[in-house]
A protein has these predicted regions:
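Histidine-acidic metal/acid-base catalytic patches
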Residues: 2-43, 52-66, 99, 188-294
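Short, well-ordered beta-strand segments
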Residues: 45-47
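Active-site-proximal loop/turn and secondary-structure-junction residues that shape catalytic pockets
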Residues: 50, 74-76, 109-112, 145-149, ...
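Conserved beta-strand positions in the central sheet of alpha/beta enzyme cores
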Residues: 71, 105-107, 142, 181, ...
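Metal-dependent catalytic neighborhoods of phosphoester/phosphodiester hydrolases
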Residues: 82-89, 117-120, 276-278
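Hydrophobic alpha-helical membrane-association signature
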Residues: 88, 125, 162-165, 248, ...
């Protein structure tokens, strides 16, 4: 997530000529290279805003595309963060049960416009989202820190405020068994500095390989450096089709092997040929590298 704020706003996709069949072919070639231990597992979903939805029907779309589930969002401030409402939570949970789809985590795209680093409303929303996460039987809340919420470690006053906000939120999250996965443009080194200052096991990094590549970071070095402090992944590669751009997802898998990660991978990628064509192809491509189980 970077520019998302309750509505679907992605970078303009760069159309690539190679079709989804090439992705499937590559996945079948790579599959034998990765024999994960039986204890390791991967689920592959998509962010609901990339499915063109902001309601429980996103789970129906995920099922139609052959995914394992979704990352849901709290919703926009203008709409009053709809997921705060018990009836909306219930509707999502009923849709998940009906479709057999999973809900992996809750994103807070609203914090891109109402920043956690200085706006007291954002701090309150984070506390409320922890309660929503617990009520829905989920375990990860993802505050997004882009746009107005972008983090700069050189801006001491903002970072000091953020640390205090996160310490309060983490105290609550830790008691409820919830992880706060902060997503930002910070480097792995700066993420570690921030996590060390907050000093809570409830705070981790929500790692987006596309965002980090955009910033010029080496994701193959950053993933092992962050290690167990990564709680979940976003996969995208600017406007490219997955597997046809800058990021070698086979090498990313090897980096993930080093940290013994099991969990969700959320597709947040461009769809130059349309979401209904490209997302099933992405799933097949990624499944060849990230098997459901070893």
């Amino acid at each position: 997530m970077s520019t998302f704020d309750g509505n679907m706003t992605r970078r303009t996709a760069l159309v690539r000529g190679v079709q989804g069949a090439a992705l499937a072919c590559a996945a079948s070639r790579w599959a034998p290279l990765f024999a994960a231990p039986a204890s390791r597992w991967f689920k592959i979903g998509a962010c609901e805003w990339n499915l063109g939805k902001a309601d429980p029907s996103s789970l129906e779309v995920a099922k139609e595309l052959g995914l394992d589930g979704i990352q849901v969002d709290m919703g926009s401030p203008k709409a009053g963060l709809p997921l705060r409402k018990p009836e909306v939570q219930k509707a999502y949970l009923e849709a998940a049960k009906r479709t057999g789809m999973g809900i992996a985590s809750i994103a807070m795209g609203a914090l891109n416009s109402v920043p956690l680093k200085r706006d007291p409303r954002a701090a309150q929303w984070l506390l409320e989202t922890i309660d929503v996460c617990k009520a829905m039987g989920l375990s990860i809340v993802m505050p997004a820190c882009f746009g107005n919420g972008d983090l700069d470690m050189a801006k001491t006053d903002e970072i000091n405020h953020l640390v205090k906000v996160l310490q309060e939120a983490c105290a609550k999250a830790d008691k409820q068994g919830i992880t706060i996965g902060l997503e930002s443009y910070l480097s792995a080194e700066d993420n570690l500095k921030l996590l060390d200052r907050v000093n809570s096991p409830a705070l981790k990094v929500y790692y987006d390989v596309g965002n980090s590549t955009d910033k010029g970071y080496d994701v193959l070095k950053e993933i092992p450096l962050l290690g167990k402090r990564i709680c979940e992944f976003h996969f995208k590669d600017d406007g490219f089709m997955l597997g046809q751009g800058r990021i070698d997802f086979k090498k990313v898998r090897r980096a993930i092997e080093k940290i013994d990660y099991s969990g969700w991978i959320q597709i947040e990628a461009a769809a130059p040929h349309g979401m209904r064509k490209d997302y099933p192809a992405y799933y097949k491509f990624l499944r060849g590298i990230y098997p459901e189980r070893g």
